[in-house]
């Protein structure tokens, strides 16, 4: 288990980022007529449109088919919004994402591969859509009881399910965000993996701007509020407006969430959450309908640290080494000066003694 200081430092880094970047900016509701294609440029002002044209032109040199497919018009706009339409910052953020995706190839992760054990547990999965047509990513922390699974694989499993959610977006209809539902029933300290959760937030900040449309936390326990108190003061109003806490009520001995039905149709809501959907996640059934991609070589082992965090740590380490070298240099210079001073003092003393001897000889 991580120390409190480590957790606090990680939370501070994340919340600092969240205060600088809004990953969940409010967008107006999308209303399309039948057969109408969503136009992402329709509501841009002149300055925003110029920024869009500039960043799109800057990426016109892309040759990798995967990069080209990733960089849609709506993708460019997500990264622009994440950096307040400052093209240089948006471009850097997007290029960092492309580099990360090229290195780790999240689209090639195989659920039946090295994440099968954690993937079978049902800690995270994708199922159905909310009332706005957004894919729903469910998280069930109580299912995370696998102590022998390293954080790297837990993080990789989360990235897999995020990619599954992204693949279900429908950009022609303006759908580019997901709905995140976390069921905290029976959640305990043994299910808390703060490291993976914090790194997941780093990942969302660095590589998934504007993707989270709504977060619904069901029956949050006392342990959750401990973590929330650390993070929430740093979140801006727009981000907080996308988060909602919903407590259940027992009806005929079953949990029900009346407020949850504001977001999800009862037909798309699982029975254990008060809906009509008879569904229990099963990895084999899921893979039948969503087979793993066929790849020559599997993606390399994930690190739970995103590139930006690594760069910060490396920079901090370099600065520390530099300060250490400067300190050693100053110490050496100080020792050299001290030695030089003692040498001068010695020479002066010897010169004085010699003079005294000469004076004594003259007297004799």
From Swiss-Prot:
Pfam families: CRAL_TRIO, CRAL_TRIO_N. Residues 290-364 are annotated as: Disordered. GO terms for molecular function: phosphatidylinositol transfer activity. Keywords: Lipid transport, Transport. It comes from the Eukaryota. InterPro entries: CRAL-TRIO_dom, CRAL-TRIO_dom_sf, CRAL/TRIO_N_dom, CRAL/TRIO_N_dom_sf, PI_Transfer_CRAL-TRIO. Residues 316-352 have a biased composition (Basic and acidic residues). Residues 113-281 form the CRAL-TRIO domain. Has phosphatidylinositol transfer activity. PANTHER family: GH16843P (PTHR45824), PHOSPHATIDYLINOSITOL TRANSFER PROTEIN 3 (PTHR45824:SF1). This is Phosphatidylinositol transfer protein 3. It comes from Dictyostelium discoideum. The lineage of its organism: Eukaryota, Amoebozoa, Evosea, Eumycetozoa, Dictyostelia.
């Amino acid at each position: 288990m991580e120390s409190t200081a480590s957790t606090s430092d990680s939370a501070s880094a994340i919340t600092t980022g969240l205060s600088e970047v809004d990953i969940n900016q409010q967008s107006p509701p999308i209303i399309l007529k039948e057969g109408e294609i969503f136009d992402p440029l329709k509501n841009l002002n002149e300055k925003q449109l110029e920024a869009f044209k500039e960043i799109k032109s800057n990426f016109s040199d892309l040759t990798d088919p995967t990069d080209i497919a990733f960089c849609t018009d709506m993708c460019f706009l997500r990264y622009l919004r994440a950096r307040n339409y400052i093209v240089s910052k948006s471009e850097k953020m997007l290029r960092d994402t492309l580099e990360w995706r090229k290195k780790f190839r999240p689209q090639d992760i195989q659920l039946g591969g090295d994440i099968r054990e954690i993937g079978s547990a049902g800690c995270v999965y994708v199922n159905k859509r909310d009332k706005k047509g957004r894919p729903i990513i469910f998280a069930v922390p109580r299912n995370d009881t696998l102590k022998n699974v390293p954080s790297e694989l837990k993080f990789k499993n989360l990235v897999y399910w995020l990619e599954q959610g992204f693949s279900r977006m429908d950009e022609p209809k303006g759908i580019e965000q997901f709905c995140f539902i976390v069921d905290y029933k029976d959640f305990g300290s043994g299910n808390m993996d703060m490291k993976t959760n914090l790194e997941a937030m780093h990942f969302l900040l660095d590589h998934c701007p504007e993707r989270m449309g709504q977060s619904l936390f069901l029956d949050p326990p006392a342990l959750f509020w401990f973590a929330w108190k650390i993070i929430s003061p740093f979140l801006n109003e727009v981000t907080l407006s996308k988060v909602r806490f919903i407590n259940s009520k027992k009806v005929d001995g079953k949990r029900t969430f009346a407020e949850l039905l504001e977001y999800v149709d009862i037909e798309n809501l699982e029975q254990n959450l008060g809906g009509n959907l008879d569904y229990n996640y099963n990895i084999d059934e899921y893979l039948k309908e969503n087979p793993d991609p066929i790849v020559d070589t599997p993606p390399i082992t994930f690190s739970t640290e995103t590139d930006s965090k690594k760069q910060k740590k490396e920079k901090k380490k370099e600065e520390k080494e530099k300060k250490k070298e400067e300190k050693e240099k100053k110490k050496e210079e100080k020792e050299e000066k001290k030695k030089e001073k003692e040498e001068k003092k010695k020479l002066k003393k010897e010169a004085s003694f010699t003079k005294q001897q000469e004076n004594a000889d003259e007297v004799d």
